């Protein structure tokens, strides 16, 4: 698949950072310690899949201040029994801007399948700028406001906080089914989300 230069640069950046951060994961050596997801070295991969479902690890208690609504807390537990797509982003991040339309399309195409998207906005210490990003890009799903990246620590041991954007697909038990350490297109993400959404709910 051919990518514009921005997408190539983003993927290359993810590869370099992921290779140097000891906390990334691969589909071959993902580990679940006590049922908890742990990132391990990605070996240069930017698309990581975890099968069978019984081998998947769960993320922690993802929760934080809602980006768009003052005084509201948004949590992963708000979406019990749903497939959840977590996207870590910042308005300052070029690849995040590049993938915004694609993420929104996948969200619209899959939400009737019991799929929810949840953003985690990081390193934006001016909240208004992050809110403008949501409005200008017509993002229809919520985001947690996490300028200090504290929420990221709940995503798994050794989470690679340097890799932005990152997208994590959680199954209906909120275990990690896939991780993307790169900017995404519809054709990258939608087939994976649909496959996970179609898994038997008692699988694993």
Q: What are these model-derived regions, one by one?
A:
Residues 88-90, 120-123, 146-147, 182-183:
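Active-site-proximal beta-strand/loop segments in catalytic clefts of secreted hydrolases
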Residues 74-97, 103, 117:
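Short active-site neighborhood of thiol/selenol oxidoreductases, capturing the structured segment around
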Residues 1-65, 199, 203-204:
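N-terminal targeting signals for export/organelle localization
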Residues 60, 84, 164-165:
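Short loop/turn microsegments at loop-to-beta-strand junctions
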Residues 132-140, 146-201:
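Thiol/disulfide oxidoreductase modules built on the thioredoxin-like
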Residues 97-137, 148-154:
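Structural microenvironment flanking redox-active thiols in thiol-disulfide oxidoreductases
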Residues 66-68, 170-171:
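Short, acidic, Ser/Thr-enriched surface-loop or helix-capping motifs
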């Amino acid at each position: 698949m051919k990518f514009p230069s921005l997408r190539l640069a983003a993927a290359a950046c993810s590869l370099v950072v992921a290779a140097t951060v000891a906390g990334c994961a691969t589909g071959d050596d993902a580990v679940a310690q006590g049922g908890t997801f742990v990132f391990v070295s990605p070996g240069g991969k930017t698309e990581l899949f975890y099968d069978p479902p019984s081998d998947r690890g769960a993320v922690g208690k993802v929760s934080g201040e809602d980006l768009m609504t003052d005084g509201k807390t948004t949590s992963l537990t708000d979406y019990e029994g749903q497939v959840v797509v977590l996207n870590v982003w910042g308005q300052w991040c070029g690849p995040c801007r590049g993938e915004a339309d694609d993420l929104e399309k996948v969200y619209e195409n899959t939400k009737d399948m019991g799929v929810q998207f949840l953003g985690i906005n990081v390193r934006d210490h001016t909240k208004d700028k992050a809110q403008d990003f949501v409005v200008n890009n017509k993002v229809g799903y919520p985001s947690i406001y996490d300028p200090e990246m504290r929420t990221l620590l709940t995503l798994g041991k050794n989470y690679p906080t340097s890799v932005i954007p990152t997208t994590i697909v959680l199954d209906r038990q909120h275990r990690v089914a896939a991780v993307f350490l790169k900017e995404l297109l519809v054709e990258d993400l939608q087939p994976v989300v649909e496959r996970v959404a179609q898994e038997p709910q008692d699988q694993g």
